[in-house]
A protein has these predicted regions:
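Short, well-ordered beta-to-alpha junction loops that form the rim of enzyme active sites
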Residues: 60-63, 130-134
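Histidine/acidic-residue-rich catalytic or RNA/ligand-binding cores of hydrolases
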Residues: 141-144, 148, 174-180
Length: 268
């Protein structure tokens, strides 16, 4: 991080789609619990590589792909779809501060908003980095930004600026196109967007490598690709000359490590 006062708040555990962990002899629920624990650990430990201390990292522990349903029924608990758990406190033991949902552990929208409001009041950020609500279609990403804005409506401390980013697009999950280390083109204009300013800080080769190593610390991005994807890449390499970085096989190593970043700047 280029800021000495960065704080990182992770909303969900990341426990679903844990088939790879079933190879360890675990059933679906146990594999999901293990993956959730590992990704929760990553959310607290990996930021240290970028100079963000654990005391400035918070894991809220809500469950993957449940945020949109939570938003529609704010007082109803929504358990994990795969792990069998329904208590967000299971991955909160290393958090640096107490939060409202620590009282009952219920995975509800009301608890999520209260947690986020408490975090905002504690860290008093001037800038919030959150997924772009119009560009990034991932349901949890859209709901995450909605939750952040609802929490801001309840806090005395008011962040002034949103930095918005997109990990996915509605019609193209290969964006940004091209190999790692290259630039990032603006995504296709499929529909009208708010007239936000752009901020595109550059990353030199050393920072790009540091970012790649930060990605490599994430358990979810480790391991070999499935055979089908390996064969597809071999064909693409031979016929289209495509290349993937040596830093990691997951697509994020190609998409996320570029010579500059791209953020949409929205004033509140």
């Amino acid at each position: 991080s280029r800021s000495s006062e960065t704080a990182i708040v992770t909303l969900t555990q990341g426990e679903i789609e844990a088939q790879g962990y079933q190879r360890l002899g675990l059933d679906q629920a146990a594999a999901a619990r293990l993956k959730g624990r590992l990704r929760a650990w990553d959310s607290l430990a990996a930021p240290l590589w970028g100079g963000v201390a654990q005391a400035r990292c918070v894991q809220l522990g809500y469950y993957c792909l449940q945020l949109p349903a939570m938003a529609e029924q704010p007082q109803t608990p929504f358990a994990s779809r795969e792990s069998g758990e329904c208590d967000v406190r299971s991955v909160r033991r290393h958090n640096p501060l107490s939060l409202p949902a620590d009282a009952d552990g219920q995975p509800t929208w009301d608890n999520l908003i209260a947690d986020l409001a408490a975090v905002i009041e504690h860290y008093r950020p001037e800038v919030l980095l959150t997924p772009h609500p119009e560009l990034d279609p991932h349901h949890d990403h859209v709901a995450s930004t909605r939750a952040v804005l609802e929490a801001c409506a309840q806090t005395r401390w008011q962040p002034q600026t949103l930095l918005l980013y997109a990990n996915h697009l509605h019609d193209n999950d290969r964006w940004p196109m091209g190999p790692a280390g290259m630039g990032i083109a603006l995504p296709p204009a499929i529909s009208a967007l708010p007239a936000d300013r752009l901020w595109s800080p550059s990353l030199d080769a050393e920072r790009q490598l540091d970012k790649a190593m930060a990605l490599a610390l994430q358990h979810d991005l480790q391991g070999a690709l499935p055979l089908k994807k390996r064969l597809r890449r071999l064909i693409q390499r031979l016929l289209a000359g495509r290349r993937w970085p040596a830093t990691g096989e997951d697509e994020f190593f190609r998409k996320a490590v570029r010579r500059h970043e791209l953020f949409w700047v929205r004033q509140r």
